[in-house]
Design a protein with these regions (language model features):
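N-proximal short alpha-helices
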Residues: 1, 19, 37-38, 137, ...
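Short amphipathic alpha-helical surface micro-motifs
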Residues: 1, 23, 41, 130-132, ...
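Rossmann-like dinucleotide-binding domain for NAD(H)/NADP(H)
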Residues: 96-201
Length: 201
């Protein structure tokens, strides 16, 4: 893999599976549109019409695990998603799969992942988040040659920082005016919070 500066596979023609298909994975799908990828997406909160706009096929959780060559995790951390990917789920994956986690560390059972990587049951992983951050020096993930680790900063660029502050201020201004911020993530609270969506103004 890339630790040895060896790239042994092409993305072209591969199947990319998304677990969670909100704003960030939708942006990823747009950015990868030139690679002739097949997209599978599992997200009960996103309509099939939204997925179709990005040429993503709605799929079950198990279908994504079993069919994807690359699986990218994009779920919030809740009681339901803690260790969403564990030993059972890793055993459903293809042996050539690359697993990417940029969501939240505890969504993935690290011990089960270490075992799958050590036994070469999956091809590799790229992790920007961990169950314990910073990743302990003693973590066996640090010793593996088929995993790429970044310390929860893989997306940081000058543009990202500028956009972060812009959207943060925009969200505060929206709420001060009684509007829901565009980036809210808990729709179950919308009716109780007293804020309205801008499109309902």
């Amino acid at each position: 893999m890339c630790k040895d500066l060896v790239w042994d596979r092409h993305l072209h023609g591969s199947t990319l599976g998304f677990i969670g298909f909100g704003r960030i994975p939708q942006c990823v799908a747009r950015k990868l549109s030139g690679f002739d990828l097949r997209y599978l997406a599992y997200d009960p909160q996103v309509s099939p019409d939204v997925m179709a706009e990005l040429q993503a096929s709605p799929a079950t959780f198990e279908e994504v695990l079993q069919q994807a060559d690359v699986i990218s995790l994009h779920t919030p951390l809740t009681e339901a998603t803690h260790h969403l990917i564990g030993e059972r789920e890793l055993r459903l994956m293809k042996s050539n799969v690359i697993l990417i986690n940029t969501s939240r560390g505890p969504v993935l059972d690290e011990q089960a992942l270490v075992e799958a990587l050590t036994e070469r049951r999956i091809a590799g992983a790229a992790l920007d988040v961990f169950e314990t951050e910073p990743l302990p020096e003693s973590s066996p993930l640090r010793q593996l040659d088929n995993v790429v680790l970044t310390p929860h900063i893989a997306g940081y660029t000058d543009e990202f920082v500028k956009d972060f502050w812009h959207y943060s201020v925009e969200a505060v201004c929206d709420m001060a005016q009684g509007f829901l911020p565009e980036s809210y993530v808990n729709p179950q609270a919308v009716d109780r919070c007293g804020f309205v969506r801008r499109d309902q103004d």
